[in-house]
């Protein structure tokens, strides 16, 4: 049954309330107290449920918590699945009160998986940057996705620069596409979460830039803040190149001109993170759901879509060393799912690595994973559509 909670507060007329914080908790079937952030849409377990509320004033001070208790009977009005998919709210957490083993579901049938001619230039190693230096550099042509994710592990502020450099003897033109930036921040999960949603909701830029031989252009000029020690920054960007364009990722001391990046020493890659250039780094995945039972679509596993794709986790080359490299998580790879279903079907996103935050586009609508915070167990999911 739907829960509707109203509240009144006493406050100065002139003073705004910048933040309102709801939490709710209950005791699960194993006797554990479970607490979730946000306002519950409904209750899906019998017993006592507690909802708390606190508000923040204009000076940043939080009120004492107000508390409201509900006693929920054993009378089931609707299952969680029935309720969530009838009252669709993309981004909300699917609690999985019954602790259904979602990983035990049968894999859905992938009719085919096709790759797209997109080159991925990925800079994620060394993830922890101790000193200024060249993090990655290679030349790209045609459609390219650029990705980096680095943490300042030194003692002084750094800037991470994403640089386009024409090292040919002819003018080179490239077009800016979608882009998403995040950081600096101390929270790596927050950085990935913000970067992904900013990229997905960004519009195609369309700006054309022509570089003369030897000329450079700062691709991430929107990231102006220096990165303080222990903070990190990331970016994901698409470009379309006519000709051959060098792209470099460099860590530089604050105040250094990015155009002097060629004087920097090359920083060695550090496992387990990777860096490299990868061909055919975009997938279109076609799924046919027959509607008979719940099924799973597995992304990010080495054997995902085996029989349809030789190597799902892409391999490439570290252009700075010539060594073969493996993108163990398909970081920066754009994957599009095309799903056909025989019946009306609900979609849940279930992270298998426990604590997770992220975002997807579902039918061109941004869906946050989740809208109210981290997913903390492999039993929970997020309602996508």
Which role fits each region the language model picked out?
Residues 38-48:
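Solvent-exposed segments in extracellular or luminal domains encompassing
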Residues 225-263:
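Terminal connector regions
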Residues 150-158, 163-183, 239-241, 340-352, ...:
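Asparagine-centered strand-capping/turn motif at beta-strand->loop junctions
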Residues 62-74:
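C-terminal edge beta-strand
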Residues 190-228, 364-385:
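Intrinsically disordered, low-complexity Pro/Gly/Ser/Thr-rich segments with frequent PxxP/GP/PP motifs
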Residues 17-40:
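Surface-exposed, flexible coil segments in extracellular/virion-facing regions
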Residues 56-61:
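Short, solvent-exposed loop/turn segments at the edges of extracellular beta-sandwich modules
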């Amino acid at each position: 049954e739907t829960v509707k909670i109203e509240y009144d507060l006493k406050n100065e007329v002139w003073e705004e309330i910048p933040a309102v914080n709801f939490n709710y908790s209950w005791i699960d079937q194993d006797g554990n107290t479970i607490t979730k952030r946000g306002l519950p849409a409904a209750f899906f377990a019998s017993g006592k449920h507690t909802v708390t509320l606190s508000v923040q004033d204009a000076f940043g001070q939080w009120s004492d918590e107000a508390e409201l208790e509900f006693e929920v009977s054993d009378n089931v009005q609707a299952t969680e699945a029935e309720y969530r998919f009838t009252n669709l709210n993309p981004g909300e957490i699917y609690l999985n009160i019954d602790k259904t083993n979602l990983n035990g579901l049968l894999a859905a049938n992938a009719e085919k998986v096709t790759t797209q001619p997109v080159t991925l230039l990925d800079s994620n190693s060394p993830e922890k940057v101790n000193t200024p230096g060249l993090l990655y550099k290679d030349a790209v042509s045609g459609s390219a996705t650029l990705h980096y994710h680095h943490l300042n592990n030194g003692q002084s502020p750094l800037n991470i620069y994403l640089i386009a450099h024409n090292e040919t003897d002819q003018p080179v033109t490239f077009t800016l596409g979608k882009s998403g930036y995040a950081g600096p921040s101390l929270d790596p999960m927050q950085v990935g979460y913000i970067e992904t949603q900013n990229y997905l909701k960004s519009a195609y830029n369309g700006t054309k830039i022509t570089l003369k031989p030897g000329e450079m252009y700062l691709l991430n000029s929107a990231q102006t803040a220096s990165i303080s020690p222990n903070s990190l920054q990331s970016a994901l960007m698409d470009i379309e190149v006519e000709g051959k364009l060098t792209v470099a990722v460099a860590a530089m001391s604050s105040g250094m001109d990015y155009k002097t990046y060629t004087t920097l020493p090359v920083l060695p890659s550090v496992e387990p993170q990777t860096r490299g250039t990868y061909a055919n780094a975009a997938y279109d995945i076609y799924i046919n759901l027959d509607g008979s039972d719940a099924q799973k679509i597995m992304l990010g596993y080495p054997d995902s879509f085996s029989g349809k794709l030789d190597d799902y986790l892409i391999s490439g080359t570290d252009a700075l060393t010539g060594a073969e490299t493996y993108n163990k998580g398909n970081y920066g790879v754009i994957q599009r799912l095309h799903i056909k279903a025989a019946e009306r079907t609900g979609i849940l996103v279930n992270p298998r690595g426990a604590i997770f935050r992220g975002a997807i586009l579902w039918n061109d609508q941004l869906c946050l994973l989740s809208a109210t915070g981290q997913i903390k167990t492999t039993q929970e999911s997020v309602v996508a559509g």
